[in-house]
Design a protein with these regions (language model features):
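Sec-dependent N-terminal signal peptides of Gram-positive bacterial secreted proteins and lipoproteins
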Residues: 4-23
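Serine/threonine-rich, low-complexity intrinsically disordered segments
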Residues: 9, 27-28, 127, 139
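Sec-dependent signal peptide cleavage junction
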Residues: 18-35
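Structural signature of tandem-repeat unit edges
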Residues: 39-41, 45-48, 57-74, 85-98, ...
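Consensus positions within tandem repeat domains that build extended binding/scaffold surfaces
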Residues: 78-80, 100-103, 130-133, 152-155, ...
Length: 190
């Protein structure tokens, strides 16, 4: 009887340990759920659209893809291009509706006077720019189209080369410290 009881206890402990290990593995696989195509790591969202998660290429001039893995790209994820010092010019493809937090931040402007991108072309479909999206970059000008709804805190903080930006009347929410450490880049919408 004692032997049966001991076997039952050991079996129950093994089941509990197995379930704990299994659930831990599930959490790890959710974080590692990124796929890769070309120079981009990405995730497929619940609505079957794609978020670009990480750019692993070395090109200096890029156009973000409209499709990856046969699905439409609608977001540039948080930190996707963070500290990519090789970038000089970026064209964000039509269809992108959101640029995540720190997506293009810290392009190396403080480590090398020639580092960092200076040109970016925004899509007409863009609705949201996340916090610190371009913070600490050498970007010189940005033109946002009508339809943009929000710009997060610190989006252009320490963009010392920024000389011109167009923010349309459609913007309903503007974060704090938007231009702290930047020049006088604001241009009224027309």
């Amino acid at each position: 009887m004692k032997k049966k009881r001991m076997i039952m206890i050991v079996a129950m402990v093994l089941v509990l340990v197995w379930r704990a290990v299994e659930s831990g593995t599930t959490q790890v696989s959710l974080q590692a759920d990124w796929l890769q195509e070309g120079d981009y790591q990405y995730s497929v969202e619940e609505d079957e659209t794609v978020t670009l998660r990480n750019y692993i290429g070395t090109e200096s001039v890029i156009v973000t893809p409209k499709e990856v893995g046969g699905k439409e790209v609608t977001r540039i994820g948080d930190s996707c291009f963070l500290r990519k010092t090789d970038l000089r010019a970026v064209q964000i493809s039509e269809g992108i509706v959101e640029i995540g937090e720190s997506a293009f931040a810290e392009d190396g402007q403080y480590s090398d006077t020639t580092a960092g991108f200076i040109s970016i072309v925004m899509p007409k479909t863009l609705k949201k720019v996340g916090k610190s999206a371009f913070q600490g970059t050498r970007i010189t000008q940005i033109y946002f189209y009508d339809g943009l709804e929000s710009i997060g805190d610190n989006a252009f903080m320490y963009c010392s080369s920024l000389s011109k930006i167009r923010i349309p009347d459609s913007v309903e929410k503007v974060g704090q410290f938007l231009f702290l450490g930047a020049g006088k880049p604001y241009e009224e919408s027309q």
